């Protein structure tokens, strides 16, 4: 038996969660847009998944949290649907293209066939654009990362022959969602003095890239049982590295060692970034780098509490559950998107 508590984080990476009112209010929106049926099971799915919002962005106010919750609603519903094996390759590619068209152009790809998730994505895009005011560069940066993440889902799901951890991490750099999640943190603070050119800084790029590696390393463990259940585990290193390294135990130790190394590198790069930063931008850069750490720490604390990853066969003791109220996500998402 293994424990997710084996992952170690600096104490300042984890804060108490923000208020959860945003989740209830966004659930009402989801029901109004007919993305989910209104019942106990869909609420538990939604709350368990979208409680990530109040863990990722624990220091945000209600207005900020609602924007973040809408973003994560779009992201998780699309991700879960595309990963659920409920649609063929042509349909999943069409879905990605439709969402991309909304995010970039603010238009529906096919006016005669608009799904409810497209309508909600358009609604979210409008609210996010309104939130940033005249800071169009911040909005565009966020849209860029969101589209890249959406377009990474199908290729990653098809990458069934992964057998190298370096190649895998190259894939997961985008597919982990870390870049877009941090970009959302910047969008939530549109009056920042930090220019979007920060994303071109090679040290900041390495800082975020290592954050993506860390999130992936942890998520591989947290989601392992869920992926086995839905037959999506072939791209999980806990599975494919056993062919190269040996036992599950050996692979898990390798991932833990990798995690510890990455955490140290993140801390080192943050220190150097702040040292190099102009004084008038330092507070806002601290906000951004701390946001990265809180997203990573929040991802950890959220995964320990939510039912999304629960499975009686999980190798991790914290995730084992026989609670009859816990429902597998793939039994929910088949009703989400009607193309």
UniProtKB/Swiss-Prot annotation:
A motif (NDxxSxxxD/E motif) lies at residues 219-227. Keywords: Lyase, Metal-binding. GO terms for biological process: sesquiterpene biosynthetic process. Its EC number is 4.2.3.-. One of its GO terms (molecular function) is terpene synthase activity. It is an enzyme of class 4 (lyase). The keyword Metal-binding applies. It catalyses: (2E,6E)-farnesyl diphosphate = (-)-beta-barbatene + diphosphate. The keyword Metal-binding applies. A motif (DDxx(x)D/E motif) lies at residues 79-84. Induction: Expression is detectable but at low levels in vegetatively growing cells and increases during development induced by starvation. Expression is highest during he ultimate stage of mature fruiting body (approximately 24 hours after induction). Belongs to the terpene synthase family. Contains several highly conserved motifs that are important for catalytic activity including the aspartate-rich 'DDxx(x)D/E' motif and the 'NDxxSxxxD/E' motif, both of which are involved in complexing metal ions to coordinate the binding of the isoprenyl diphosphate substrate in the active site. Terpene synthase that converts its substrate farnesyl diphosphate (FPP) into the sesquiterpene beta-barbatene. This is Terpene synthase 7. It comes from Dictyostelium discoideum. The gene is TPS7.
